[in-house]
Structure formats: structure tokens, C-alpha cells
Amino acid sequence: MKRTYQPSRVKRNRKFGFRARMKTKGGRLILARRRAKGRSKLTVSDERKKY
């Protein structure tokens, strides 16, 4: 049986990445909430970046 999670970096970034979040009003609200909470990673696309 095929497992449900078949990881793909491209699909993940397109669906949950920073630019995808910025496209919609709801996505921008998510980013605002995560900034207010003080998250070091706002979106999944931040995981690859070295600070």
C-alpha cells in the first residue's frame, strides 16, 4: 500500500510557502499571527535558510 505522505519540496513550497501565504488575505493573517507569536520560522520555506 502506498503511504499518504510522499514528500516533495516543490509542492510543499507552492502550497505552504511564503509567497503562497502572501497571495491570500487568510494567508497574510496567518503570517501576522506567527509574527505576533514570535515564531522563528514563519513558513515552511524558511526552513532551508541559514540565519
Curated annotation (Swiss-Prot):
GO CC annotation: ribonucleoprotein complex; ribosome
Keyword Ribonucleoprotein belongs to the record: yes
UniProt-listed Gene3D superfamilies: 1.10.287.3980
Single GO MF annotation: structural constituent of ribosome
One Pfam entry name: Ribosomal_L34
GO BP, sorted A to Z: translation
UniProt entry tagged with the keyword Oxidoreductase: no
UniProtKB keywords: Ribonucleoprotein, Ribosomal protein
Similarity-based family: Belongs to the bacterial ribosomal protein bL34 family.
Name by which UniProt lists this protein: Large ribosomal subunit protein bL34
Gene from which the chain derives: rpmH
